[in-house]
């Protein structure tokens, strides 16, 4: 007998043993097929969230499956240095001590960051172990460790030497609080209620006439270089080429024609500010205007404008109105609007809903800023230095396109190819520099004249310059730069290693759609460029895990479920503290608490990692977002418990018994049709689950395994086995014991990739009993293979008859409202021989007996059903008056519920205005009530006949 199922106890025991024994490591036998997978490196600052648990369940399931298929498997884990996120964490710690990074200086500050990383940076990888991830921890990397640092430098220098990296002045997303450029992924668009200011721009040659420009950013007016109109807009064609007076400045700017302007939007006139708007930048580039920068890096108004052409060359500067100099952009907005009003330029102010770009770390409004940055050229062709391959000579963007167009890289689901191509066809050069201290410092040095020397180290740079005293570039690289190299930086490149031969390309990348461009495309570019190979064969795109209402999980919204809390459990008060801390809107705390109490009235009970994993697998349909339902996780905790209890039953009935196993044992004879049927179902399940794993359909694998174990094995076969073990002859009992063990052991191996802990625990006991202990761990045992030769069609047909008979008896009992504790005899009228079936019926349908008769006995009260040509009758004694009263009371109760629900659904506007999921639930409840009412009425009519 096994002890009570305790996930915590078995999980800690087995994971530690797996890791200590080195089971996660590949044996590097290059004659074996390989399976490798890269972990999207989570931020070193991070903790495990539901998206990680979802993503890692899929990756670990694949790794365990292919390991059991005999592959040389390598799942390579690592963490990302997360430049901005990590620097913010440490800066906040220093701020609590009234110290800034500038007080410490760069070197001392970086020492503090490394100290923090060593103490706190491993949280997420420890949590990955809690989920059961069988990653090869001996290969764990950090994107700023020494090996990755050397690779980053080598790649940067080679790209520079090939003419693919350059320094230039471009418009970037600028976070004024952080003081750095940020990527598009680090910018959130937040819907806000703002204003649209309508401003008069008078004609220079006739100030009485003016065009009206509508803008949401009047503070950038100082940097305007033109006003654009649509060339087809007849209202303004006569003005094209004329000069306008720029309000508040006295400067004049031209009216230009550009198809970017929508005739029907606003006034049809758009101010063009190329140094402070991405769309305006493109318009200005087409018309070769100047770029007039009016803000410093803190987003304060400059005293003198910085003026450049589109080659980045400085142009003559000019003074900005003195009264605005030094003002923050929003203070400047307020003052300028007042001045526009006073001077008669402000026509009107309209309320306007707009999407404001904000830094995801600071919440500050992002400012498009013209700065000097380092870029990787996406469309330029390299000037040599590439490995021979089909990608040689192509630009980085064309390499990435070719990899997908040729089928070398496959997207699953396929529709994501369209998204990928859309991004690639509109690609811009990649801004790779960041004005931070934490990160890979760019390997470039400057002399006093501003000449730049890119080199692997300072000594090499000084050799290039022919002098000493060079100053190193202070900027660091975008975090995505080092992340883009992990497919080969983790395998020994630039050396030709066995790991590169065995594991590049990897088999699949499992990731979310939001980083297809930021990470997936860049890995394809870099890997094809430097190795001539694609980084991976398949890209499996999964959906986002949302809360039960379909909202994105966010700590700031108070709707996050911590996967570790699902594994370990958490009491209600601690859960409420977690959910109401750090809210974006603290005033919503009571509402968050109320919702949490309703959803988790007693907190979250311990589910265990296996239940969490099975839940995630069940959600893993291709590409769809997931609305996480806590009840489903509870159901799969019960599923694990069902497997545990089923194993207990099998052990109770097989230990110290002759089960037909052992060195001298002979094959059992006398298998019953239920024995043969469950083996049939096992083989069918093996085929279906194998297909599901190999096509990334973990949802189908989970559904198939659940149905087989719960319905076929536990609900049907174990119940039939009880009859056979109690009533069968010795050979029949031996065959049943043999089948119980055989099917259970194979099922545990089938289940292992999804629920590894419970299957390991049970397999260690079950496998030796059926000669299946072929390895020290279930993860090293072979995955089951289907034997189509074992499928017996007659067994399937016989089982169908038995299931129909049992179903008919259960329906009879239900129709007559016979209580579960009441037993009654069953009579079956049929010309067929039903002896093989009838012996199972009493135990499975609570009968006193089941017998076959030539003619059903006379009984006016007994219900009769027809099943497969046989007529079935339950002989029951019924007190008509009592039963009629009971059913009438039940009918009255059902009618009240029906009337109430019908009234709700008939209420004008309800079905149109109420949330769709509530309407669907009401309709489903109505159908269920109507079905119950029909059955009650049927029983009443029978009693009245």
UniProtKB/Swiss-Prot annotation:
Catalytic reactions of this protein: tRNA(Val) + L-valine + ATP = L-valyl-tRNA(Val) + AMP + diphosphate
Keyword tags: Aminoacyl-tRNA synthetase, ATP-binding, Coiled coil, Cytoplasm, Ligase, Nucleotide-binding, Protein biosynthesis
Location of the protein in the cell: Cytoplasm
Motif ('KMSKS' region): 552-556
Enzyme class: ligase
Domain of life from the UniProt record: Bacteria
'HIGH' region (motif): residue ranges: 42-52
Gene Ontology cellular-component terms listed: cytosol
GO MF: aminoacyl-tRNA deacylase activity; ATP binding; valine-tRNA ligase activity
Protein's UniProt keywords contain Nucleotide-binding: yes
Residue stretches in coiled coil: 879-945
Major subcellular site: cytoplasm
GO biological process per UniProt: valyl-tRNA aminoacylation
EC nos: 6.1.1.9
Role, per record: Catalyzes the attachment of valine to tRNA(Val). As ValRS can inadvertently accommodate and process structurally similar amino acids such as threonine, to avoid such errors, it has a 'posttransfer' editing activity that hydrolyzes mischarged Thr-tRNA(Val) in a tRNA-dependent manner.
Subunit structure comment from the entry: Monomer.
Assigned protein family: Belongs to the class-I aminoacyl-tRNA synthetase family. ValS type 1 subfamily.
Domain notes: ValRS has two distinct active sites: one for aminoacylation and one for editing. The misactivated threonine is translocated from the active site to the editing site. The C-terminal coiled-coil domain is crucial for aminoacylation activity.
Identification of the protein by name: Valine--tRNA ligase
